[in-house]
Structure formats: structure tokens, C-alpha cells
């Protein structure tokens, strides 16, 4: 992909510095989620190779600069929860995913991982698996959809989904680089494909069990933004980045429990769908901002106002794959979540609805903490 913007990083110059001996020191890049559902990070030096998340030190940052704390009491603490090999610095360097905590020992109001983790721990015997399909759209540095004609539009949708060839796919180099970065880091990325709208792509992560699902999606998003940064391309997770006859972007959520995956599991899939039907509005609140622009009943979506389910129906709220219906066990797909979801909220409320509420966790109240 040719890039003309001088904002593009000069990685060919950087390379000779990346090859320098670090003299036993390790660089740990701490990553966290900010008040807008974006990602922030900063690096620190450690004096030895990290083998356990428990050995990672806590850190802090200025929460008043990220919308997570007032200026008069701005320290927010970073508590490491997972780490991954760093695909950019490589060697023994790592990327650390961290939760945000207030100085009074409470989780920051934008830290939804803490609440979701309680649900997964309570229902660990259910062995809940997820697979998330992250759709996104690429823009150039001037906020035009990448590869689209200046001041115009490409041909209508049709040839772009899983397309091959110039004029049908755009920025494949970005996508391939991201794919390799995830594999290197041990993210359970299971596939990629070009989507229905040109310059819209999707990657899938999973199956992952419990809280690890959202952890891995967040770190995969971080890698995507970092890769795109090097190519001078912007990543949008907006569920309807372009008005008109263009597909929106979602984060379809595939769900199963141990009982659903066993022979005869269709009964448990149907039970779960019945439970979901009774909490449709509660789920929708947690399924991403601006999702009403996407869930219109068009462009392979269900209507936001009604709950529906069906076999192989991509216009339903919940889709049962035809192969699952034939075999009588497996998983189901919730097609309602938008591309900009917080996966901790979505997987957490899914666990709460399917497996049961617990006394000390409530995902709806957890989401509402953001506005307090």
C-alpha cells in the first residue's frame, strides 16, 4: 500500500535501533481502556524477563488526561491482568493488559472487567466459550474511507465481501501485518476476511473461555491500531461509519457452554435463546453506542426494537448455524452487538443471562456506573 502522508512512521529507520542489545532489560508496554472506549499505553523498563503476571508491578497514570479522574485527584492505578509477547519490539519485551483502579481501592468506573470476572468465576463449571467477530473500517489520514475515489463512491456492494483483486480489496497489507502480530503474541485469532463494504474488514478471535475472550479482543484491537499507525491508516469501530446503502459494522458474538457443545445440546441453546428474549432491551443497552444506526432490519441486521431468532438467518437477533441445527448441538450467534462494544460488558451480561445472576455482580448496573 503506497502512502503519501508524512505522518507514516519510518519503520525502516527504526529497525536498526530495534536490533540493539537491551543489556538484559525488558520493555513492558502497559495498555488500558480509557473513558471513551479507546486504548492508551505507555512503556516502562523492567530488569528481568517476565514469566508470571503476578511478578508485574502495578503502575499509575494521569486519569485527568484520559477522562477517568478529576484533576484534583488524578492518579489512576494500573493492575496487570495479562501479558503477551510484543510483536513490535520482539525479543523478551511484552505488552501488558491492565485494569484501572481508583486510589481508594475501587475499580474505576470504566473498568468493567472486574465485574465480568466475578460472573465467570461463579460459573466456571459452565465452561462458557466465546468467539467474537470484530468488524472495522479503514480511513485515510484525511478521514476518507481508505481507497475510495476522492469526492466520490466506489461501485455498489457486491464484489467486496471476501474479494480478491485490485479494486475489490483495499489495505490487505495492513490486515496481513495485524494477523501476524496477533499470531506472534499468542492471541487466538482464528481468521480474517474482507467485508461487504469496501475497506471494511473483519477478524475473528476465539474460541476463548470466560474473561480471556474480552482480554484477547482488547489486545487484538491494540495491535490493530498500532499496525495501522505504522501504515498511516485510521481504524474506525463505529457501527455505521457511512450513511446510505452500505453495511454497518458489528461484533457478532458466538456463545456456547459445555452442555450446549455436547450431544443433545440444542435443548440448552433453545433455553438460552428464551432467556435472551426476555432481556432484549437490557442487552441492547450494553451492545454499543450508535447501534440504532446499524440495527435497522436492513443490511443483514435485525431490528433493534424486536427480538428474533432463526436457523441460518442473518436478519435475526440470534442465529443458529445450519450445521448446529442439523447436528443438534454446538453454539449460537448473537448478531446484535456493535463493532464498538466493550467485550467485558457483552460477555459479562451474556454469562449473567445464560448461566444466572449472582448476588455481587450486575452488568446493567456496572454499565450505568459510567454516568455516575
Swiss-Prot record:
GO BP term, example: glutamine biosynthetic process
Enzyme Commission code(s) on record: 6.3.1.2
GO cellular component terms, A-Z: cytoplasm
Entry-linked SUPFAM superfamilies: Glutamine synthetase, N-terminal domain, Glutamine synthetase/guanido kinase
Molecular function (Gene Ontology), one example: glutamine synthetase activity
Gene3D superfamilies (alphabetical): Glutamine synthetase, N-terminal domain (3.10.20.70), Glutamine synthetase/guanido kinase, catalytic domain (3.30.590.10)
Localization per record: Cytoplasm
Segments forming domain GS catalytic: 112-372
GS beta-grasp domain boundaries: 26-105
EC class name: ligase
Catalytic activity: L-glutamate + NH4(+) + ATP = L-glutamine + ADP + phosphate + H(+)
Keywords assigned: ATP-binding, Cytoplasm, Ligase, Nucleotide-binding
Quaternary structure and interacting proteins, as annotated: Homooctamer.
Family according to the record: Belongs to the glutamine synthetase family.
Protein name in UniProt: Glutamine synthetase
UniProt organism field: Kluyveromyces lactis (strain ATCC 8585 / CBS 2359 / DSM 70799 / NBRC 1267 / NRRL Y-1140 / WM37) (Yeast)
Gene: GLN1
Amino acid at each position: 500500500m503506497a502512502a503519501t502522508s508524512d505522518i507514516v512512521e519510518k519503520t525502516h529507520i527504526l529497525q536498526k535501533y530495534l536490533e540493539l542489545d537491551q543489556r538484559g532489560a525488558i520493555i513492558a508496554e502497559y495498555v488500558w481502556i480509557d473513558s471513551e472506549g479507546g486504548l492508551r499505553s505507555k512503556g516502562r523498563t523492567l530488569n528481568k524477563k517476565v514469566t508470571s503476571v503476578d511478578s508485574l508491578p502495578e503502575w499509575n497514570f494521569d486519569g485527568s488526561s484520559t477522562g477517568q479522574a478529576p484533576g484534583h485527584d488524578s492518579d489512576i492505578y494500573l493492575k496487570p491482568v495479562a501479558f503477551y509477547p510484543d510483536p513490535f519490539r520482539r525479543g523478551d519485551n511484552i505488552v501488558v493488559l491492565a485494569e484501572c483502579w481508583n486510589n481508594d481501592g475501587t475499580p474505576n468506573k470504566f473498568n468493567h472487567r472486574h465485574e465480568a470476572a466475578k460472573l465467570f468465576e461463579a460459573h466456571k463449571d459452565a465452561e462458557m466459550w466465546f468467539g467474537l467477530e470484530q468488524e472495522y473500517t479503514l480511513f485515510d489520514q484525511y478521514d476518507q474511507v481508505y481507497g475510495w475515489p476522492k469526492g466520490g463512491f466506489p461501485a455498489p456492494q457486491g464484489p467486496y465481501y471476501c474479494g480478491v483483486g485490485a479494486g475489490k480489496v483495499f489495505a490487505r497489507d495492513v490486515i496481513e501485518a495485524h494477523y501476524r502480530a496477533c499470531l506472534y503474541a499468542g492471541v487466538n485469532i482464528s481468521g480474517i476476511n474482507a467485508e461487504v463494504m469496501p475497506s471494511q474488514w473483519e477478524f475473528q478471535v476465539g474460541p476463548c473461555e470466560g474473561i480471556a475472550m474480552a482480554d484477547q479482543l482488547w489486545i487484538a484491537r491494540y495491535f490493530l491500531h498500532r499496525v495501522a499507525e505504522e501504515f498511516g491508516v485510521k481504524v474506525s469501530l463505529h457501527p455505521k461509519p457511512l450513511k446510505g446503502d452500505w453495511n454497518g459494522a458489528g461484533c457478532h458474538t458466538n456463545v456456547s457452554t459445555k452442555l450446549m457443545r455436547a450431544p443433545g445440546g440444542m435443548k440448552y441453546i433453545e433455553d438460552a435463546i428464551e432467556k435472551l428474549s426476555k432481556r432484549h432491551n437490557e442487552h441492547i443497552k450494553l451492545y454499543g453506542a450508535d447501534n440504532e444506526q446499524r440495527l435497522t432490519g436492513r443490511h443483514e441486521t435485525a431490528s433493534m426494537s424486536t427480538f428474533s431468532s432463526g436457523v441460518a438467518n442473518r436478519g435475526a437477533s440470534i442465529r443458529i448455524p445450519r450445521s448446529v441445527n442439523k447436528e443438534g448441538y454446538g453454539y449460537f450467534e448473537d448478531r446484535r452487538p456493535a463493532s464498538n462494544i466493550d467485550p467485558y460488558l457483552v460477555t459479562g451480561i451474556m454469562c449473567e443471562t445464560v448461566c444466572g445472576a449472582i448476588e455481587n455482580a450486575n452488568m446493567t448496573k456496572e454499565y450505568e456506573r459510567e454516568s455516575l
